[in-house]
């Protein structure tokens, strides 16, 4: 059973009305788009069955909660183009980016306002994902990183970028490692001119700021 997800960094699908319209442009069908994926992830080739959309809760609309929405995108299915499942996570967390683990069995989705990370099992029953864990101690476990932004798959682990810190709430932040099942591993603070932390400086400044992450594999 194959599946794919779209996130704001790679696709404009941000809200329910938007992505329902977007489903109609999957012509003739939804195919895997690997352009934003980690090279450590198992590759998907061919027809997708489902699209997972991590959506923002809106006060006064439905239950008002952030939720993971599953859409059937297989043209051979009787539910093609329809929402087949929704899963609310409780409250509004400023739903933002999401990403698969390297084995694509779990989808990690972050909330910027609450610094929570939600881990969904999308492998056992791809049509009906299950919320299997909520990381609600991200700030404490990471040593002060705030706002989990980008999720990036490593072999057996997930790397999370943070937008800020809980000391001065500025841009200095870190990369935070977890195991695929959500156990904290390590925090790697971004290099500064005062402390490069073993990094090789290639630009003019090292200011400790952090936003996104990509890997340049060397083969």
Give the positions of each predicted feature.
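A short loop-to-beta-strand structural motif that recurs across blades of beta-propeller domains
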Residues: 67-69, 116-118, 174-176
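Short, solvent-exposed loop/turn segments at conserved positions within beta-propeller repeat blades
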Residues: 61-64, 112-115, 166-172
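Beta-strand-rich domains and repeat architectures in extracellular enzymes and scaffolds
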Residues: 33-73, 80-105, 109-112
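Bacterial N-terminal signal peptides that target proteins for export
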Residues: 2-18
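Blade-loop segments of beta-propeller domains
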Residues: 80-150
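Residue-level detector of Asp-centered blade-edge/turn motifs that repeat once per structural unit
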Residues: 45-47, 102-103, 153-155, 216-218
